[in-house]
A protein has these predicted regions:
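Long, low-complexity, polar/charged, intrinsically disordered or flexibly structured peripheral segments
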Residues: 17-32
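Single conserved hydrophobic/aromatic residue that forms the stacking wall/gate
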Residues: 1-12, 16
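Generic detector of short alpha-helix boundary/capping microenvironments
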Residues: 1-4, 21, 46, 146
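Extended polybasic, low-complexity segments that bind anionic RNA or targeting/receptor surfaces
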Residues: 28-210
Length: 210
């Protein structure tokens, strides 16, 4: 056959060869070939749940967030003077002789992460931020090669009406999640099925859930 035809046939045959062997590597009928009817990765393992059951689970998880004993038993650290539920509206920061007051929902973008951490420390929740930061470990197994290198403990959950501003401020703080009230579910309030997550609410979020 012409030289070009020999090259094309040789390239096509190389696709089915393994290094150092002459048997096909993708044909299920040959030795060393792929599995004929392997498991399908596209299988959907999700299960349907009634809407009333979802609502009941979410409400039960919300009730657990106002119980200091359940929050403490989950491993969270906070000042004993804190009264639950934790609801905030505005925050005043004093720094370098200047006083700044801002709405929590519309946190200024400049130095927003520093302001967010200072706000949590002012509420008496700084110890839990340090717990999540120091508890960050490298995951065992192949997850380190698949974008899941670190395992970070869950820390504060912040429920807001609009998550745009606070989400950007808290996205680099380990263990902190910001969720809009309309998207709140039991998995956010009780990660892993453990009730009593340390939760901070904004007044706007409370109004949005009414």
């Amino acid at each position: 056959p012409p030289r070009s035809t020999r090259k094309e046939s040789s390239a096509a045959s190389d696709v089915y060869k393994r290094q150092g062997q002459t048997t096909g590597a993708q044909n299920p009928h040959t030795r060393g070939g792929r599995r004929a009817h392997g498991p399908k990765v596209a299988k959907d393992w999700s299960q349907k749940l009634n809407s009333k059951q979802k609502t009941l689970a979410r409400n039960s998880a919300i009730a657990a967030t106002v119980n200091p004993d359940m929050v403490s038993s989950r491993g969270h650290n906070f000042d004993e003077s804190i009264r639950f539920p934790i609801i905030i509206d505005s925050y005043t920061e004093s720094r370098e002789g200047s006083v700044e007051k801002f709405d929590v929902e519309s946190l200024p973008l400049q130095n927003s992460t520093r302001k967010f951490v200072a706000m949590m420390e002012g509420l008496g929740l700084g110890a839990d931020l340090n717990r999540a930061k120091s508890g960050r470990t490298i995951r065992a197994g192949k997850g380190t090669m698949r974008g899941r290198k670190y395992r970070t403990p869950k820390s504060i959950l912040l429920v807001v009406a609009n998550r745009d501003g606070l989400h950007k401020a808290a996205r680099n703080v380990p263990g902190v999640d910001v969720v809009a009230a309309k998207d709140l579910c039991a998995e956010d309030l009780a990660p892993g099925g453990d009730l009593g997550r340390l939760t901070v609410w904004t007044k706007s979020a409370i109004k949005a859930m009414e």
